[in-house]
Amino acid sequence: EPDYRVKQRCLNGHAPWPEGICTKCQPSAVTLQQQQFRMVDHIEFSTSNLINDFINFWRSTGYQRFGYLYGRYEPYPDVPLGIKAVVEAIYEPPQENQTDGLSLNLPWNEEESVDEGAAACGLFKVGMIYTDLMDAGQGKVICKRHIDSYFLSSQECCFSAAMQTKNPNVTKLSASGKFSSKFVTCVVTGNENGEVDVHAYQVSSTCEAMVAADIIEPSVEPSVMRVKESTLERYVPEVFYKYKNKYGVNVQESAKPCFPVEYLLLNVTHGFPLNQTPLFTSPKSFSIENRPGIEAQDLKTLQNHLDATKGDAHLVNVLSDFHLLTYIKSTGIFDKKDFDTLARIAVTHSEADAAALSENSGWQTFLAIMQENDNAPIRNQDVNFGATQTIPSVAVDDAIAEGSASSDARGGWSCRHCTYSNPRTAVNCEICVLPKD
């Protein structure tokens, strides 16, 4: 595993960096070349609706969009020892629209909750996806990324390297317990025919190490990566890259001050299965998160979504929606055991589990709260940033079990709607937000 940082514990008897350095603790020169292997060979989207729903935001607003790919890894038989990432869902974190792109604040508050919800479904982050679309009129989009411009900009390469470092590939065959990353980057942009297309990439392990060592930085020219200068706090080794000149001879040149980003890129193929069998099969999609002004995620929307539920078989179909599951988890009403039951119904489509859920006290309480709160959302979204606020993390079943006796002993009052025991000074119920009287 490449590492271009100065070793901090050198045994040669000199002062530690930056006061001293020797040939044993300083990193060796870097020679850039195309990486000969890929950690992931193919990206498979379980259904085309994933991409259509994702780019609908751009179609509606003209703004770009970012999302995380949740899925799993499977063998890819089309290449020897191949690995493919199967994408089952796209989650869109809070983001702020800009005229020239978008702004992210990562990690966001609910990232851990979303990851736990995905894990309950047997999924985890396998990559990220974002749009880079510009309308050309007549149903076409502008082709901005091609062989004469760039495929992935230097800034995007640094971002991908940081995300790959954050999501390493765990292996027992490495001394550090990890090696490179299977995290992929997908860009939805226009192709040479003016059609919307997906391009998938990874950056090399060399790029990951150079970004971690603070050796490179983005350039104003998107197709060029800049090598930083050495300072008292940062040691930058010699960086070279090789290419064939017009005579077909291999030539080695210094990469300072800059070099082409193609030396850091890896192409990854993508596609859709011939027989689409997605994990989530809800016939009607629930509202997508963090789309203020376009789609709302609140109790009223959820109640309307569940109102059509007729019997356990239909409940199985309605619950089989990743966005629905993550929203329900964000409310904090269900404990881990009950939410795991919801997730199991969503992915296994078991009518027996759905029948058991219908009789579950937690589910019945959840339905009762929704009926009493047609206009009182548990979760509110900020118009500018998509920030969320959730109800207090209190188990509803435990609150019901406390009863009115303990409430009277503390001088509080019990909500006549959900029976939660509130403090005496509370005007509205802390759980269902309804007034005391």
What are these language model-derived features?
Residues 10-13, 54-60, 75-81, 90, ...:
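Beta-strand elements of modular eukaryotic interaction domains
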